[in-house]
Amino acid sequence: MDSFTPPLLSDSLQMAMEVENEKSNPPCFSCIFDNQNGGRSFSGESYLASGSLKRVLLRLDPSPNDYEEDAIEMFGFQWVTETALVESCGLLFGLLRQQIYKLEDLIEMNSSDFGKAANLHSEAENIRRLCINFLHYVKVFIFRYLEPPKTENDGVLHPYEELEAQFPSLLVEELHSLTLHIGHLCELPSNVLAAFTIQHQAKIFPPSWHLLHLHLDIHWLVLEILHVLSEKMMRQVVYANHFINLTGENLTNISLFETHCENLISDLISLSIQKYTKVRPSEALTSHHYPCNCIKELWILLIQLLGFRNKGSQTECFWSLVNKKLKSIFERPTSSESVSVFGTTQCKDPLSFSLWIVTHLASLYQFDRNGNLEEKKQKESNWKFVEELLKNSIGAQTGVLEEHLRMHLQCCLTLCRFWDWNLSVITILWDYYSKNLNSCFTVPWLGLKGLASISKTSLSMLELVKSCCCEQQIPTLYKSSNSYLIFLSILARMMKEEAESSGVHPWKQIKGRIYSKFHRKRMQELTEVGLQNFFNLFLLLAIVAETEDIVSRVLDLLDFLTPSLVSPSQRALIWRGHFAFLLIYVEKNMDISVLAEKLSNAFRVKAKEFLVTKNDYTQKQNLWTLISTYIDGVQEVFETSCYLSLSEEKLLNDGFTMLLPACRGAELSMVLNFLQVVIARLRSVHKRVSQGLQPGNADSNAQLPLVAKEHHLAVASALWRNFFPYLKSQRMSQTPPSPQLADTAAGFALLALDIPSKALSDLQPQPVLSMMQLFGWDDMVWPHLVSRYLSHLIQNSALCEAFSTMGYTSYEALTVRSWFRCVLQMFIDQPSGTLAKTDAERTVGKAYMEQLTEMTRLIFKLKEVESILSKARVEEPVLKQDPKNALVQFIKAVGRTYSGLQTLPEKSAMVLKALEYLGDVLKYVKPYLKAKGPPEGLQLAYWIIGCLVKFWAPILATSKAQQLLFRIIDCLLLPHSVLQQDKELPGALLSAIQESLHLYLQGLSFICCQSQARGAYLNQLLGSIVQQYFGRFLPPSPTALGAGQHPMLTALCSSITVPQALRLRKTTLHVINEHYMQFKGSAPPPRLASVLAFILEVLQRTQASELCDVELVLPAVLKCMVLVNELQVKKISTVIVQYMVQGCQARSGGEHATQLTSVFRQFIQDYTAVYDHRVFSILETVAVLDQTLVTSLIPTLTQSLKDSEYKQGLGRNAAQREAYKRLLTHLSEAGQNEIQKLENEAG
């Protein structure tokens, strides 16, 4: 079947179709909700949700599917459906009253027993259902069976027709009696009214709950019945004739409807008063005015019914009735009648209550006839009454407190959502607030939240005003905003909505009223709070109305202020206000040049005052308050501006050139942070505009990028001109610069990369290169600045590409050189003394170490460095080491890489690159040497350069690098102060040398082996170093030798190449022999035992005896054994001889044995004549170790013996010969033979 679009149906036809097949219980008030409610505001049985009200208003059958049988059961009796009410109207209403009595009696029987309570609930529910069914039947009967009045009398009437004609009058009387019987809602007993508080989720209700809701049903159904009767009677007036005849009072269906409406509204207001007594002002809008959802529905029913009838001029409108009743609350009860209207409930604050209930009632207009929520503007407003309430609220006689005033205005703000704008309300409120601008509008019991606050920044000032323009309801508005700000919210909402709805801006209607309140005297009376409120007002107006006109007027008004009478805090507030207007300009994409120039000129004046003010601390503080306000404001403008195309450069004038030199500490930090933000913002926006990435609308003005770029050039020019000269002057300051200086310099470097044309002329033609040379590669700049500066730039791909494009290949090498210097100079700012560091110094040191660690991580990612590390096979964990160890690892990697090269060109290039990495390395450590500290700095310098000498020995051995080696030795190891033997070296310096000397010795010994051209000179240098430091590190006694190991011992015993070790050993032993083992006559040299202990330690650790040992050391040791009687010397000497003899044995035959024999032969010849017994004793000891050696010396010994006897001229020396024979007895057969010879000669 083809689909079709049904024609539009009228409301009445649609209702008829909906109920065609439905049959349900008659509607009633119900606050019982189930899970199947479908999210509706009211129960499905309610008059709204069931459609009952809608059917009545549309003149449809109230219950089309009910009461269709010929007979109907009511109150337990059968009645004829079509005639029952006409024939038995009084009886039926009497039965209704009986049922009400019966339900009232059940209340007395209420029980806490669950079984009894369930029975009572069931019985009460049945009674209520009987009553409701009857009243619905009355309504249906009138609609279906009551004939409209006939205009002409056709003669004699049937008795039923007579009864039918009298029925409307009788019905009015019965309804009147019924209303009198049930009385006022508020007059119900307290135990019945307490049923409002029963939870709606309950399943079993007490009789009181049923009775209370039955009263609500009766009150409403009486109105429905009267309305249906009026419609059926074709709006003719129905008089209650019998009542009139009895009482003389007039009673009609119209009067009864109006009276009952008034009474019902009075009752509902009375219930709301009871509810309001428990409501705090801060919770007014979140606290409902109805104790039960059924009361809410009843209010909506009244609004809909009275609104419908008012259209036909049948009844007063809803607001008229409500206003009348609310006005009566303001009158003190003077009679019993006035008391009865609202029962015993007295309203302590009728003004607040009236605004509160009007606001909540206005919100109920959003519900339609079906109880569905429709958020739309209402044509029917109650502004006139609200105006009267507001006049009372802010009247001088009333003196309403701020805590109530906030609630009153919050109600008005809520009403703005429902009703069209009202100029009178604005006028009334503005008249009040214009007189009280200096008020703080605080609520004492709110504490700090209730205090008036002055906005600290222009952005917070603007955000505060913007919050007043927010259309969303803010639950915490009472606590977060004072009444003045709520007034501004009302003003903003009314102006915006009127402009949107009518197209005519209401600003033209109210501008005169606002401007007229400000004149010279009034402006001069404003306090700081008053100025804040002044700016809040005009900022809001600038947002929602004509911005330029308003700002121009504000500037004129501020000119009324006398400058000398404006306090510093007021001046700062005025500047913040100006910047808030600038932010509005920026958000509206309006050029700011006029206002920016006015502000920047004022800033220039204050910056100059700040520069020249020296000793007046208070004046300086006041000026800084203004200056910091300006800086914050400019920063907010730059951060807010989307394209920086609105003349923002006007804010960066030459006032900053005067300000920067005068700033100290936190002040300078603030300015530099601000500068970083501005540079970063400019670069970001410039990049986006250059790439054509325009946010927002794709149909942007095509000229925008071109205009924006012109402004970007102007901003960049202002930055270079007014900020950079100061930065440049601070890079070589006497004290370490702040980290922000490095950050800002890095920002300028990147700015030079993005917009090179506007850099200063002395940086051209390659400003990026110039910036690197100034802040990154200059050896005179503080290492703290360099490390942080380069850390920002090392990994910048655009920067690397720029250097590559300009063909500058030394970029990475120079960066590595700077890293070398930063690591070497990490302690340069510490005092040279050994005093404990303060917490501040520790913090600075820690921060610099963290910065160096980050720089090291980035350096190791440079392509050149990665290549070197890769070739040297350095493991990844090296990258995570501290800077000192990482630098040592890099030095080792360079050395290993060089050693792995094969061709001469490669090696030559590597030497040049290594020297480029170093730069003038001695210049980096000179500050430590000059200050002779700090100890950490000296140790670091000597250690790192020692590593260079050792691990770069092959490089330093080349002709290109040898000059650096000589400078290192002259500067670090053999300076003039070392050569002065009578002058004691500083302890810190000596300690640093002792810790690292072995590195220099090992490296230098390698170079001595490699260098051909200058080998002799290098050997001489090596000898000089050993000569100068051997004695300095030699302990006074052998027992102290192991306590602090001698650096030369470390050098000699480390794992180095054989030629290198031999060269160092030979040189060291030569120096020891020449300078530390020479006797002065028979007097032994000083610290002889320590010298011998050193030699012994070398022999023991190397586990070998070299030829040089025999040549240089053995003669001296043998001499010590002969000439020195000290037990320790003899003992150590004996062990040395033992080691040497055994060492030569290990190298059997050859040069070592020959040299050993030669030394002993000479020893015999030199000392036998005088020290024969000692010589023979020594040789006895040697014979035990090497009998062959001593046997080979027999001829020499015998000849020496004879020579000695000859010289003495006394013949044979028996004692000598006996000593000699004892020696010979240790030499087996050869010795026995020699003894025999000697005896034969004697015979």
Swiss-Prot record:
- Tell me the domain of life: Eukaryota
Give the UniProt record's GO annotations in the biological process aspect: chromatin organization; double-strand break repair via homologous recombination; replication fork processing
**Which keywords belong to this entry?**
Chromatin regulator, Chromosome, DNA damage, DNA repair, DNA-binding, Nucleus
Where is this gene product found? Nucleus; Chromosome
- State one Pfam family annotation: MMS22L_C
State the GO CC annotations.
nuclear replication fork; site of DNA damage
| Keyword Nucleus applies | yes
Matches recorded under InterPro entries: MMS22-like, MMS22L_C, MMS22L_N
Q: What is its main location?
A: nucleus
**Annotated GO MF terms:** single-stranded DNA binding
The function of this protein is: Component of the MMS22L-TONSL complex, a complex that promotes homologous recombination-mediated repair of double-strand breaks (DSBs) at stalled or collapsed replication forks. The MMS22L-TONSL complex is required to maintain genome integrity during DNA replication. It mediates the assembly of RAD51 filaments on single-stranded DNA (ssDNA): the MMS22L-TONSL complex is recruited to DSBs following histone replacement by histone chaperones and eviction of the replication protein A complex (RPA/RP-A) from DSBs.
Task: Describe the protein's quaternary organization and the partners it interacts with.
Answer: Component of the MMS22L-TONSL complex.
Family to which this protein belongs: Belongs to the MMS22 family. MMS22L subfamily.
Q: Which PANTHER family would you find in this protein's record?
A: PROTEIN MMS22-LIKE (PTHR28547:SF1)
This chain belongs to the protein called Protein MMS22-like
